[in-house]
């Protein structure tokens, strides 16, 4: 399966964890029991997002002008956490790919304004973490 498919799997599990308040581990088990195969990449991302949630939320709060994480829709919040985790912890996913994939998830699963919101927040995070493109200085 593709990374895009794995991201969708991770998104579904992380979303369910967010809206129900359930830990991700039993949800991973339920996914396998009822839906079958879960990509290793999806499992890695789910566990990573759960482990890093507080840090991810702190970064998102710092760049999402006027929209603290708790005010975001659960769908947008989940997409942002997933993409930010990839940007910070998955070396073979360039930040721009994580942003583009998150925008695609937002187009498929969130509201009309979500793709621009998600893209804007993640580009702000990218600038803050990695520095502005072309300035030659790390963030």
From Swiss-Prot:
GO terms for biological process: DNA-templated transcription termination; transcription antitermination. Pfam families: NusB. It comes from the Bacteria. GO terms for molecular function: RNA binding. One of its GO terms (cellular component) is cytosol. Keywords: RNA-binding, Transcription, Transcription antitermination, Transcription regulation. Belongs to the NusB family. Involved in transcription antitermination. Required for transcription of ribosomal RNA (rRNA) genes. Binds specifically to the boxA antiterminator sequence of the ribosomal RNA (rrn) operons. This is Transcription antitermination protein NusB. It comes from Rubrobacter xylanophilus (strain DSM 9941 / JCM 11954 / NBRC 16129 / PRD-1). The gene is nusB.
């Amino acid at each position: 399966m593709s990374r895009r498919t794995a991201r969708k799997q991770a998104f579904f599990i992380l979303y369910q964890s967010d809206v129900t308040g359930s830990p991700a581990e039993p949800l991973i088990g339920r996914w396998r029991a009822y839906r079958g195969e879960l990509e290793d990449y999806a499992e890695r991302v789910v566990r990573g997002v759960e482990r890093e949630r507080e840090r991810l939320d702190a970064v998102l709060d710092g760049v999402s002008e006027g929209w603290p994480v708790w005010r975001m829709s659960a769908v947008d919040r989940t997409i942002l956490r997933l993409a930010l985790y990839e940007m910070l912890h998955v070396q073979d996913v360039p930040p721009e790919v994580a942003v583009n994939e998150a925008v695609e998830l937002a187009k498929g699963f969130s509201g009309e304004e979500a793709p621009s919101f998600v893209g804007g927040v993640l580009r702000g995070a990218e600038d803050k973490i990695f520095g502005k493109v072309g300035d030659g200085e790390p963030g």
